């Protein structure tokens, strides 16, 4: 076989092996399954809960909604004339889908200059930091997944203005985040 063909076959075999922790776990509707597949995630969520007070289930429901537990998640491309790529819809990236500017604020505020959005520990810590600020600025309880998600999506000022009230789709999504947090919480109570 030619050297080029061997390299191509090897590359194909390696690419089919999977993507480690940046690929999502299987069965995202089962918190216990996620915990078994990704014990590193659970350690990160518990560390965030200890530091910031945000319940594990609220963090998990937020990450599910934002990235489906994909560490390399990005927003879709925008297209001109339906075919010419014009860049991404926003700078959101990683598990938490944090925007560049908000991520920079987090790194400055926490002193975590090397924090990365595709690292589950950093992403969950970011969520804890952001939701704690939502509690402080907007009076949202840390276990209120619905309103925490609305503030997470709209920003603290947007939440304070009630910008989400004119977005029926977002209100529906926030209800889904709340339902998923309740589901995850009940599952985690059974599996420890």
Where are these regions (language model features)?
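Residue-level signal for mature regions of secreted extracellular proteins and peptides
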Residues: 10-11, 25
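C-terminal motif of bacterial Sec signal peptides marking the signal peptidase cleavage site
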Residues: 13-16
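Catalytic glycan-binding domains that act on GlcNAc-containing polysaccharides
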Residues: 20-192
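Sec-dependent signal peptide recognition
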Residues: 2-9
